[in-house]
């Protein structure tokens, strides 16, 4: 399986393997194992916390539910858990805008530009069915390169 196949399926379905917005944290760790604990996202609070499985990053709220899903794609290689990647889980990074939009089109996954996250050195698009975001860096004199893919939160607020 290729990285774009995984990201396109994630954008189309709103999930990456066992992970989706609202998934119970115990279900995630049962399926993927223990993650790297990056730390807290709050001010002087224990929750919410950011956890990582390679380049898959998950924000988890106080009630232990997945609040946000991010896949960092700006590195030379992108690492995902083998169980969600359908194999080794290591892929070439630095994916072009043209390749992403082509893959979304081939998968019949409609998208639209996201003007709120588009400015001088960055552009972004949103998949209409899931709200998944693809944000690109625009290097000077070069084509846009995929920086991050995210699944947006559902508005849940447990104060943590």
Regions found by a protein language model. Give the residues of each.
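Short helix/turn-capping signatures at newly exposed starts of structured segments
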Residues: 1-160
